[in-house]
């Protein structure tokens, strides 16, 4: 695997004389190291150069913030959770619980396959879509009714934590 050349947002080679250089240290200070690293991984398709812009880095900083907020939500809603709750059998789980665990398994398979083939951009894309669109936008919202008065609060806490931990493990190589 040979890494790509990083170009500006117009596809031009970065050059000090052209004045189109994006200083990675400045971007790390402004948006965070994780956001810059994930941006580069997300756009590093095999055989293609990376068109980098500050807006793209900012977008992945927003992704990092979304994950941070999801983590805070999960951790703030673990009151009374002692970590001993075992997952219920599949037929006893709610539809939302079965759905998110199914999507987690599919995402895990997709990420592992992409990493084995050195397709880091595909792995990053799968992780991004799962965390943003499915875990944060859907499952966290669906879980609120279970957490705030539902009969399966402990099961919901367990699944929230399990999926969050899995997401963080997905992100570890990035």
Question: What label would you give each PLM region?
Answer:
Residues 15-22, 54-57:
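Short secondary-structure boundary/capping segments
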Residues 1-19:
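Active-site and channel-lining beta-strand-loop segments
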